Swiss-Prot record:
Localization (cell): Apical cell membrane
Name used for this protein in its record: Solute carrier family 12 member 1
Keyword terms: Cell membrane, Chloride, Glycoprotein, Ion transport, Membrane, Phosphoprotein, Potassium, Potassium transport, Sodium, Sodium transport, Symport, Transmembrane, Transmembrane helix, Transport
Species: Rattus norvegicus (Rat)
Domain of life from the UniProt record: Eukaryota
Amino acid sequence: MSVNIPSNSVPSGASRFQVHVINEGHGSGAAMSDSTDPPHYEETSFGDEAQNRLKISFRPGNQECYENFLQTGETAKTDTTFHAYDSHTNTYYLQTFGHNTMDAVPKIEYYRNTGSVSGPKVNRPSLQEIHEQLAKNVAVAPGSADRVANGDGMPGDEQAENKEEDVTGVVKFGWVKGVLVRCMLNIWGVMLFIRLSWIVGEAGIGLGVIIIGLSVVVTTLTGISMSAICTNGVVRGGGAYYLISRSLGPEFGGSIGLIFRFANAVRVAMYVVGFAETVVDLLKESDSMMVDPTNDIRIIGSITVVILLGISVAGMEWEAKAQVILLVILLIGIANFFIGTVIPSNNEKKSRGFFNYQASIFAENFGPSFTEGEGFFSVFAIFFPAATGILAGANISGDLEDPQDAIPRGTMLAIFITTVAYIGVAICVRACVVRDATGSMNDTVVSGMNCNGSAACGLGYDFSRCQHEPCQYGLMNNFQVMSMVSGFGPLITAGIFSATLSSALASLVSAPKVFQALCKDNIFKGLQFFAKGYGKNNEPLRGYFLTFVIAMAFILIAELNVIAPIISNFFLASYALINFSCFHASYAKSPGWRPAYGIYNMWVSLFGAILCCAVMFVINWWAAVITYVIELFLYIYVTYKKPDVNWGSSTQALSYVSALDNALELTTVEDHVKNFRPQCIVLTGGPMTRPALLDITHAFTKNSGLCICCEVFVGPRKLCVKEMNSGMAKKQAWLMKNKIKAFYAAVAADCFRDGVRSLLQASGLGRMKPNTLVIGYKKNWRKAPLSELENYVGIIHDAFDFEIGVVIVRISQGFDISPVLQVQDELEKLEQERLALEAAIKDNDCEEGKGGIRGLFKKAGKLNITKPAPKKDSNISTIQSMHVGEFNQKLVEASAQFKKKQGKGTIDVWWLFDDGGLTLLIPYILTLRKKWKDCKLRIYVGGKINRIEEEKISMASLLSKFRIKFADIHIIGDINIKPNKESWKVFEEMIEPYRLHESHKDLTTAEKLKRESPWKITDAELEAVKEKSYRQVRLNELLQEHSRAANLIVLSLPVARKGSISDLLYMAWLEILTKNLPPVLLVRGNHKNVLTFYS
């Protein structure tokens, strides 16, 4: 027995699932035969409030769950409160697949983009929400887990700010009306009725069919590639631009989008001029010319394009109805032509060259007969625009019900039908009409007259004078041949009107649609004006008027044969990129490339792209060059502007594949000293908190080495991981925004040293592993907790253990500007509050201006709001003064000192110990940078007083072999003498608080002190390394003497032997060594060569 629990019996805070309880008996014979089946789930619909509820069917043995449900409305007994993740309103995921879980079943809503017109974007439960431990006995307020969001994790209460588009009343088309009809009307354009006869007259039947076939090959290959791209995901508005931009990226899409939009606008002019030519021919026959043929074409064309603009502005629904009517007229016209070919010709038609089907005419017209100035490719250039209609359906992709299905089906069928029609008309007209005819019924062959052997002569007409003077009729001279051949001429005229007007109308509609999509993406900032749409169909009215202006300009040319070749290259460029997009997406081997249209091949698409490019140059080489120059210019412009879009293009996919292949290939390359590059881990914390440290490192790694900004989150892993993950993208984005070529990496660890160890061991990839650790000098080492000091010195030891070089950077003001950043954040918050306050005041002013009772109430509100405003301003002023005074302005200036161009000066390199050459290589790389190029290298090395000149010559020889330019070399001969008493006293005072002084105490007391304070400096230790301590103090004296005015000092880092030098003594060495100096880099390589003088 099945019991249906009505929905109103379920508590509002529990579950909205419709539950069907099936056979609740325990082991009874009433058990259903499928009792071993898993729980059954299905989606049901119960009106607006209960869409897509989950129906849970209980199986035998679930009596406890059933009783619990009757009592509490829940499907499981639990003390835990679950969050809601239903697609529409609040609910709990319970008994999913028979278990109490928050896991969500697969739904299409989880995979939609934000603002999708097909439904809302829904967020599934996050991994943390189903993985973390649930807090017990915590009530969840209704609506707290509403997940209908904007795709960025925003809660449901902010949903009002991200309303979905209103799609009610929007006109959408199927594949027949939206694609097939449009493509057929565009392909059966002006060329079918008023140029195809001339084309086959020039090229003959053989080459004419080849011209049609070549065009069909280009369009078919493009159609296949377009179908593959269309079926690789949901297609939105934008047509060819959308396909190319989402496949190859904004650089290609933006450049070709403008060109394609312009080509479509010119295409309107081409069809309107074709229509006007036909009307002018009719006016000639009736002797009703207005001015002259050229100006009449301009007048009629201008009036026509105004009418077409009116239809377009009226909306897509009216335009679609007009297209259907025009197609019916066009089909009648084509049928009328074929009927006319079998109706016996009268004398008037014979005099004009029409003799019905004749084998002699077919044979005579089979070969080409190009007139002066014409050839195969010039004729092809005139015909090819007729084939460009294959994008008519794709160009209105945003107005299709199902673009993924409609575009491939409609486009490929339209290509097939129109190709058959073109070839049929070409063959029929060539088999019936001779090339030249006089139109005079008196030009018959008289008995005994010498015949010239032409087909017309054999059929009783002598048109031989057409060889000496121009004639008005025949395939080569009369553009209205199809009207003459047809059974009823006015129907062909109607067909011409239908073909030309429908094609012009389709182009007039599609060009603004494509342009609107391009402008919405904001790739070209100045074109945002044309992105605005009007009405429920989001009609691009501004784009319509722009297209009208362009079309009007080209209509004034009034010459169809001039206009047609102009757009051929633009359309071919678009086709080439569509084919290349399909090839590129396949070649990139991205898992996201999964087109449902399987009839494609990447190499065929590449062939199609090459064929399009070749045809462009063959048709008109200089026009092809101009097209590519324009496209290249636009490509460079978009690349330079770097639009803020991310479409997952195949260019990005190929970048990944290339990087992966190169990284793998690099692993097979053995290390060589000539290929050494500094690959640095920089312990910056958040990159924005220590910009100076990052700047100096970036100066010697940019374009030549690896730079990884690292941060260690210390604390409970659970909390640290959450904080770390939330800031990853933001910090990497900060690096990109500041044009710093570096990566950001972070780890969570229980202590700082463990985190750095992990980074030193695991950072990098293959050969791109860090070989140098860069850290800032710990300025507060005397005040810092002992654990921090141990960690700091410990990571230096760890780096040496891992055979990684170390660079310690010291500047007088320190690196950390976190306090300044905190103040800036506060200022930004206050500024946002101030702007919001001003907006609220402005809104209240507007409401007050409306008058009435409502305005009276708003007036009081305005007074309450305006009072705190001065207080906010005073707060801002106070914090600004804090920013300048309390937070040291010198710290801000010091943080930017390496961003500035360094003036003329020196980089002093104190290469005291040979570490493999890193101490010399880093300053050399710095001098190659634009900001440091005015700084000269001065080299300081230790030596003996009696051998200064010899050692100077020796060092100069070594540096010249290393090909390192230097300004001067100094040999320091007195480096090992004792420092003066004042300097030594400063050092002794520095270490005094940390000394144990065990030698002045008895043995027992001394041992006790050592156990209690093992970190302190013992007298024994200090005596053992006294000479080294002398050296650090003496070096500072020499640095003060020789390098006080240097822009930068690069100095060999002293190494503390483990177990011999305490952490405090080592930090005292570093302190006294770098005290009161310009910026200092303490460098120690891993003692492996990084310089060589061998080629």
